[in-house]
UniProtKB/Swiss-Prot annotation:
Induction details: Up-regulated by NaCl, mannitol, low temperature, H(2)O(2), methyl viologen, and abscisic acid (ABA).
Stored SUPFAM superfamilies: Thioredoxin-like
Location of the Thioredoxin domain: 67-214
Name of this protein: Peroxiredoxin Q, chloroplastic
Biological-process GO terms, alphabetical: cell redox homeostasis; cellular response to oxidative stress
Reactions catalysed according to its record: a hydroperoxide + [thioredoxin]-dithiol = an alcohol + [thioredoxin]-disulfide + H2O
Other facts: The active site is a conserved redox-active cysteine residue, the peroxidatic cysteine (C(P)), which makes the nucleophilic attack on the peroxide substrate. The peroxide oxidizes the C(P)-SH to cysteine sulfenic acid (C(P)-SOH), which then reacts with another cysteine residue, the resolving cysteine (C(R)), to form a disulfide bridge. The disulfide is subsequently reduced by an appropriate electron donor to complete the catalytic cycle. In this atypical 2-Cys peroxiredoxin, C(R) is present in the same subunit to form an intramolecular disulfide.
Pfam families assigned to the protein according to its UniProt record, in alphabetical order: AhpC-TSA
Quaternary structure note: Monomer.
EC number(s) from the headed UniProt entry: 1.11.1.24
Biological role stated in the UniProt entry: Thiol-specific peroxidase that catalyzes the reduction of hydrogen peroxide and organic hydroperoxides to water and alcohols, respectively. Plays a role in cell protection against oxidative stress by detoxifying peroxides.
Annotated transit peptide: 1-64
Length: 214
């Protein structure tokens, strides 16, 4: 009987080549204070080569505010816009609004500062003082205060020590200093903590509403 011989070849399968598609996401790039950005020194861009770092999903959960409602915040002494030392204890005996903001002369921060200015008489009527804190130096604060006729105190937290002591959370994966406001009662106890980075004027609405409810 005749036998049939087949070539000894293993079957070959061709797989289509796959090129990973680039992840479509917005990149972060740092801009100067003078640029027109609502994000106070941070701009979102499709063209920048600087990509945001990849953080684990638990990143936000890992930030625990050190100062919460019902607590006594850490004391501090900082220089004001005139280079004079100002202590938090100076304001004890009356309600005080302490708002942390990213930087002077940035669009969102200027809008917030001017909103506090425009409502300052309402804060005074409620018996409260207003203090703004950022990492800018005293000379920057002085120019900022004079330019926009701000009637309240600005304090310089160079090195962001007080910001860290109070546990003010950052935004945009740590690239942007947080915008957080605290209301302390006459005994120095925190009664309200409000955080809203991209709606700066809401800080004024929420703190006034709270003060007027006391």
């Amino acid at each position: 009987m005749a036998t049939l011989s087949l070539p000894n070849h293993s079957p070959t399968f061709a797989l289509p080549s796959q090129t990973p598609k680039p992840h479509s996401s917005q990149n972060l790039s740092i801009i100067s204070k003078s640029a027109h950005s609502q994000f106070c020194g941070i701009k979102l861009s499709h063209s920048s080569s600087l990509s945001p770092p990849l953080y684990p999903r638990s990143y936000k959960a890992s930030i625990v505010a050190k100062v919460s409602e019902g607590s006594m915040p850490p004391a501090f002494t900082l220089k004001d816009q005139d280079g004079k030392n100002v202590s938090l204890s100076k304001f004890k005996g009356k309600p005080v609004v302490v708002y942390f903001y990213p930087a002077d002369e940035t669009p969102g921060c200027t809008k917030q500062a001017c909103a506090f200015r425009d409502s300052y008489e309402k804060f005074k009527k409620a018996g409260a003082e207003v203090i703004g804190i950022s990492g800018d130096d005293s000379s920057s604060h002085k120019a900022f205060k004079q330019k926009y006729k701000l009637p309240y105190t600005l304090l310089s937290d160079e090195g962001n020590k007080v910001r860290k002591d109070w546990g003010v959370p950052s935004d945009l994966f740590g690239a942007l200093p947080g915008r957080q406001t605290y209301v302390l009662d006459r005994n120095g106890v925190v009664r309200l903590v409000y955080n809203n980075q991209f709606q700066p004027e809401k800080h004024i609405d929420e703190t006034l509403k709270f003060l007027q409810s006391l």
